[in-house]
Every structure is written in C-alpha cells, then in structure tokens.
Amino acid sequence: MSQKRKVAIIGSGNIGTDLMIKILRNAKHLEMAAMVGIDQASDGLARAARMGVATTADGVDGLTRLPVFQDIDFVFDATSAGAHVKNDAFLRQHKASLRMIDLTPAAIGPYCVPVVNLEQHLQAINVNMVTCGGQATIPMVAAVSRVAKVHYAEIVASIASKSAGPGTRANIDEFTETTSKAIEVIGGATKGKAIIIMNPAEPPLMMRDTVYVLSETADQKQIAASIEEMAASVQAYVPGYRLKQQVQFEQVHNLTLPGQGTFTGLKTSVFLEVEGAAHYLPAYAGNLDIMTSAALATAERMAQAMGPLA
C-alpha cells in the first residue's frame, strides 16, 4: 500500500496544471489523485487524463462524486478568491478533516510562506499561500526584520502578461490587499504595500521583484548576510529564485511616511529574479512556479508531519 497522501487540485488552469506536473514528478509524500475543472475542453483536464489522473469538469460537486474522494487528504485550490470560500465550505460538509492549500488570495486560513512560518501551521486545516509576489518578497522583508525593526516595506512584482491567466487578472485587488497584509503579518513590517505590474513585452520577461525596506539603523553586513541566507533557503524549493544584484543600502532622514509621520533610518533595496522550472509554462513564468513550488513544499511538510497512513 502506498504511504503517500492522496491529493486533488481544483482549477485546471496554468497554476493547477503546473502544480499537478510537479506533484507527479517530484512529490515524496503526496500522490496526485484528481484534477477538478469546470471546462471540459481545458488543456489541464486533458493533460491530467493523459497522465492517468482522475478528472471531473463538474467542479467541487464532481470531485465529491469521484470514487477516489474518500481517500483524499489534501486539496489544492487554484481557482479564485471568491470561489475558494465556497469550495472550502462545500468540501468540509463532505469531509471536515481535509487539508486545504489555498493558492488564491482568499486568505480564510493563516498566511504561509514556507521559509518563514510553515512550522507554525503544520496542524492548520486551511493555509493561504499569499500570492506569487508575496512568496518572492516576504522572505526578504522577514530577513531584514530578524535583524532590525521594519517600519515600512514596499514590494513591486513585475510579471509577464502572458503568464497571467484569467484567475490572476480577476484577483488584482485581492493580490495587492493580501500581499500588503502578509508583508505585515509574516514579514514583520509595521506597514506593508504591494504593487503588481503586468509587462506586455515580447519576448516575455522573467518575473522581477523589487523590495524596499525602511528599518531602524543596523549593521548593513548583518542585514545583507541575513538576506543571502534567506534567499538560499527559498532556493531549496524554488531553484530559479535569485538575488539579481547586491543588496543596496541608503541612510534616509526625515522621510514622510503616510500615516506614520517622519522616518529616519536605513533603506534596504533588494532586487530579485525568479526563473520558472518550465514544468508546464515557459521559464519566464517564475511567478507561477514560485506559487506552485511553495504550495507543494507546504503540503509535503504537512504530510510528513502527519506520519504514515493507518
């Protein structure tokens, strides 16, 4: 008998399909059992069927009717924020113990960025993977936070237009709200702000992220070392994650922060690039790769903590 925990993915679009391929190829503690969509003609459902995975085009209702549903322990939701709230409520009526890994900005469970706070949420029945921008940048804010108090952090996530499917586009407001909040809750900033840019350039550009952190004055070498150490930790599950250039520091004086008064201290600027593993979409779609990689790392660690199947 397999000792792997069975999983289902809701959402057969870009993120769901990439995640499915990662689970099939790389998962040590998880087994891909079902792919759920609402469009019978979607490439994701067709690909899942070709790979021997049970499929349904009838949404979560169809999932509960699949014979394999009774054996499923984890459900990844790669739909949209509004849909996730309904999906979670519906599935819990059928199986209350399901572990939901939420890849939308719904955030009905605690935020989870694996390198920063996964160990605190191993027992949670619903965790939220924040956003692609959050997964890339919050570790950098947290890296500064563990050295100096962070008063303000602002991130700019630039992604290729081609990598943004309808779900991403429908959730732009939720992206900025959820990422901003998570910068504060997980990153440790007193105030967080997030901006997303969809770049229509051809050929498509790789995901780029810029992180600006205003903190109390501290040892710059210590902050740089903390950032480099954190980047290496992220690379353990997102190999294409890297610092694009050296961390930059600037002493600032009497800078006005809206709602916070004036600030004097250290400005740290971090420049990141995220290259995708190209499991389903091209390498420029690092924004999708970091989400699916973080979700997989989270569920793998949870499954490991649950111990062997009875």
UniProtKB/Swiss-Prot annotation:
Spell out the catalytic residues. C132
Entries under SUPFAM superfamilies matching the protein: Glyceraldehyde-3-phosphate dehydrogenase-like, C-terminal domain (SSF55347), NAD(P)-binding Rossmann-fold domains (SSF51735)
| A Pfam match | Semialdhyde_dh
Kindly state which keywords UniProt assigns to this record, in alphabetical order: Aromatic hydrocarbons catabolism, NAD, Oxidoreductase
What CDD domains does the record tag this protein with? ALDH_C
Q: Which Gene3D superfamilies match?
A: Dihydrodipicolinate Reductase, domain 2 (3.30.360.10), NAD(P)-binding Rossmann-like Domain (3.40.50.720)
Documented EC number(s): 1.2.1.10
Q: Provide the reaction this enzyme catalyses.
A: acetaldehyde + NAD(+) + CoA = acetyl-CoA + NADH + H(+)
- Tell me a GO biological process for this protein: catabolic process
Question: Could you say which residues bind NAD(+) here?
Answer: S12, G13, N14, I15, S163, A164, G165, P166, G167, T168, R169, A170, N171, N287
Name recorded for this polypeptide: Acetaldehyde dehydrogenase 1
Stored InterPro entries: Acetaldehyde_dehydrogenase, Acetylaldehyde_DH_C, NAD(P)-bd_dom_sf, Semialdehyde_DH_NAD-bd
Q: What is the lineage of its organism?
A: Bacteria, Pseudomonadati, Pseudomonadota, Gammaproteobacteria, Pseudomonadales
- What GO molecular functions are on record for this protein? acetaldehyde dehydrogenase (acetylating) activity; NAD binding
As for family, the record states: Belongs to the acetaldehyde dehydrogenase family.
